[in-house]
């Protein structure tokens, strides 16, 4: 299992053109909304969506389900305020935790006008698996189309607060630019298909 995961890690810097088939169609979502509570789903309506913020879990090897359950459990532990609208898992699965029109506690002052995506990663590098990366591109592109955004409206948690998140995309600027290019390509592919 570990070998499979290690071999499936996407080398962001070199994979720029390998996601040409990814488009901005709605991905398969496992909707598991958090209970409304003051620690992870306050039930506050967003002020409008002006961007998509990418995060990483900073918890190597944890699954999307484990992260979703952690967010939901904050209503009991009351240890912090944290959540995201979506979590992309190690196998590319996507769990929706908070509706896109509601605030998630992920991006500080940008909580009120962005959608947040938390991304699972197999190891300390913060690099994503191929399956995770492909789902992240599709989900991000779909959200951009849904809210009339472009890849230029996609930011890292780092761009809001200076926090090293998502780690791999902060430490490898070329990988971040390649990701945004992949998102832009997926958006344009879908727009071209709808015009035909």
What are the language-model segments listed below?
Residues 1-3:
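Sec-dependent N-terminal signal peptides
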Residues 7-107:
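N-terminal catalytic cores of peptidoglycan-degrading enzymes
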Residues 12-29, 123-196:
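Basic/polar, cationic surfaces and motifs that engage anionic cell-wall
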Residues 44-46, 78-79, 105-109, 124-135, ...:
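Extracytoplasmic/periplasmic, Sec-exported soluble proteins
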Residues 54, 115, 154-156:
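Hydrophobic faces of well-ordered beta-strands that scaffold small-molecule active sites
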Residues 57-58, 110, 115-124:
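Cell-envelope and extracellular/periplasmic
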Residues 78, 85, 89, 122, ...:
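Active-site-proximal helix/loop segments of hydrolytic enzymes
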Residues 83-88, 115-121, 144:
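Catalytic nucleophile-His microenvironment captured as a short glycine-rich beta-strand/loop
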């Amino acid at each position: 299992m570990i070998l499979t995961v290690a071999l499936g890690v996407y080398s962001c810097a070199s994979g720029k053109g390998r996601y040409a088939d990814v488009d901005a169609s709605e991905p398969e979502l496992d909707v598991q909304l958090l209970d409304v509570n003051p620690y992870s789903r306050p039930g506050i309506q967003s002020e409008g969506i002006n961007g998509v913020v990418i995060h990483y879990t900073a918890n190597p090897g944890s699954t999307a389900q484990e992260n979703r359950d952690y967010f939901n459990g904050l209503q009991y532990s009351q240890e912090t305020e944290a959540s995201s609208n979506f979590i992309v898992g190690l196998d590319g699965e996507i769990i929706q935790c908070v509706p896109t029109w509601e605030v998630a506690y992920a991006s500080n002052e940008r909580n009120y006008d962005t959608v947040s995506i938390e991304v699972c990663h197999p190891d300390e590098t913060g690099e994503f698996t191929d399956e995770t990366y492909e789902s992240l591109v599709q989900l991000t592109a779909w959200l951009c189309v849904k809210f009339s955004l472009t890849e230029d409206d996609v930011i890292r948690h780092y761009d809001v607060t200076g926090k090293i998140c998502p780690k791999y995309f902060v430490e490898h600027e070329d990988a971040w630019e390649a990701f945004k290019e992949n998102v832009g390509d997926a958006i344009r592919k879908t727009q071209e298909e709808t015009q035909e």
